[in-house]
Amino acid sequence: MSIKLIETALSEVLLIEPDVFKDHRGFFLETFQKKNYAELGIDKSFVQDNHSHSSRGTLRGMHYQLKYPQAKLIYVITGEIYDAVVDIRRGSPSFGQWKGFSLSAEKKRQLFV
């Protein structure tokens, strides 16, 4: 396993560069593998998997859950997005800070929030 984990300025917000296996047919990658991610310190049980499509120029709002917070693993399958994360968790070392991340289908990076 050579998944690369990149810490960000925000507490518990991580960039992940997964293993990508390329050949003449295209590529293969595991978007999530519980054991491998647990070894990186991401030991979460994902209970929901969503897929969305945004037309060029779309701005989506911020999402959060107070009563039942959810971890999110974000990646892009076509094109590119700019994802802004704002830390509104009281008691977090990075409370009140924000950071923006560019994610693209080409680079295949993931964002764990």
Q: What do these predicted ranges mean?
A:
Residues 1-106:
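Non-catalytic, conserved peripheral segments adjacent to functional cores
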